[in-house]
Amino acid sequence: MEQLKQGLSGAQEHVHRAVQSATPIVNDALGKMQHFMAPYILQARSFADNHAAPAMHRVQPFMQQVQARIQKGFQHSTASIDASLHGLQPWQVAAVTAVVVLLTLWALTWLQAAFAEVRETGFVQSLIDFLKTLPGIRGLVKREHTKMMVKLRASINKSLLNGGEQHLQLPKKGLPAQQIISSLEKRGQHDVPFDEGASTVSGTLYLSGEAHCALLNDVYTRFSHTNPMHADVFPSVRQMELEVLAMTAAMVGGGPEGDPEVCGAMTSGGTESILTAVKASRDYMRAKRGIKHPEMVVGQSAHAAFFKAAEYFKVKLVVVPVGKDMRVTAAAVARALTRNTVLVVASSPCFPHGVIDDVEGIAQVASKAGVCCHTDACLGGFVLPFAHKLGYPVPAWDFSVPGVTSMSLDSHKFGMAHKGTSVVLYRSKGIRRYQYTRITDWSGGLYISPGFAGSRSGALISTAWASMIHQGEEGYLRITDQMMKAAGAFAKGLQQIEGLQLAGSPAMTVVAFRASKPRALNIYALNDLMSQRGWHLSALQLPPALHMCFTGQHASIVDSLLKDLQECVDILQKDSTGIKDGMAPIYGLASVSPDRKIIGEFLVAYQDVLLSG
């Protein structure tokens, strides 16, 4: 203790000496500063005396009048209140005051909520919502909604088994296997037929090659009983999942030749991969920077799953417009960033137009701001790496780009596996851990889950593994070259059709197009005419357009597709009204209607019919 006292005494003496030695220096500096500032202070005082004082002298009488009026009004108001409360008991005055305060607070809360609603939905939508509450308009909307439901149900239910066998309750006795197979064959006759290499449907069917399909079916059968949640029971499935993740990471800038820290997890599809990445990024940024009101910046062309994620996870969605080339730029993203931004998104490519956003620029903006950056490669993940190796012009888009923190890519699309598998990758395990769910106080035991699902199909994981092993790099190169050539030939031929033009410059196998003169050619009527000829193109909006996604099943359809497009355009140019029935009126209404809520109600009605018949 004595040593401690001596140490403190010595420290105190050192501090005292330091202060004594510093005091003259500080005083000298202050003196010099005062001497330097003296002329400026004199000038400021002179200006105030010459200009400010006369101005205040002129304003002073006016201010005195204003003050007198305010004082008089205040006195009048207090006198009126005193008169109105005259004769009331103190408790009555207190009660009236409490009621007035509560009513005022209620009114302020209501106004705040109303203004927030207007800010969120926009003034036009808010005005439309108010008009729809008026008695006459409300009844009209209800009647039109009923008519729409009747027509919609009749149109959709055409594809159901009219008069055929249906099972709406469990049969009293189980049916024999042969009868079940026979029933399935009859039901399958209502589906769109597919000929190998000659699909008439945009995207949808990504598997190609009879031998490849047979292999995957066999693999699925062998592992149909497995569940990776029980890794100790099915270690083979765990091993296959690890290998799928490793092979996928190595394709897109991870692995031994890239960033070895890239890691991930398998999901049920692209939407779940996107949802998982958004959830992980939100929670990571909350832990890292304490962001409690998260925002996510996406392009207008970003996949709908990001809109779904924003709704699910209470993340404010900030949508930025695309340029004339349909790409999201770094400048647009930079303008949208705030202190609450947790994630920015770039598409590689975007679903609507097949173009790749400025991933390098967007990732740089995100890195500078210290926020996460996701590149959505659900479509491009199993095409762009091989297109690049084949020599096609592919901008940087994967984990080789600094600042990219997560990625989604679908093994069940161009990875050519069975439907139900996708991959979400992260720059590091430090981000991936935020997609996990861990429960430590459950009576059922300690619980950890890598994603939203508990049980998962080991059979689907095994088919993804088998597909990648069966195709190999050589197989993916061959199929990619075939698809790129088909898409290129279609894009070139499309530009020869008068009345149509490309919507963006396609980066891979998605080719979007629109009318060069929308008033002269209804692109949705064109889609209806093509549907009558058996084609199933994807209809887009904002702006109105169509697209064709080429897969391994479209090797031989380019010429026939271009031929039918040319003939249908010729028909519409002669008769612009097109056909009476079809989706053109609905899509046309959706593209111009300012009432987005009524369009949303139509979509809900459509989904209800699909689920209930």
Model segments located where?
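Conserved beta-loop-alpha segment that forms the PLP phosphate-binding cup at the N-terminus of a helix
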Residues: 241, 245-246, 260-291, 305-309
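PLP-dependent aminotransferase-like
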Residues: 286-342
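Active-site phosphate-binding strand-loop segment of PLP-dependent enzymes
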Residues: 328-375
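Active-site C-terminal subdomain of aminotransferase-like
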Residues: 369, 374, 386-509, 513-519, ...
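Non-catalytic terminal extensions of PLP-dependent enzymes
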Residues: 2-238, 242-246, 250, 255-257, ...
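Short Gly/Ser/Thr- and Asp/Glu-enriched loop/turn motifs at secondary-structure junctions
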Residues: 259-261, 503-510, 541-545
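Active-site nucleophile and cofactor-binding loops and adjacent substrate-binding regions
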Residues: 236-237, 264-271, 298-300, 504, ...
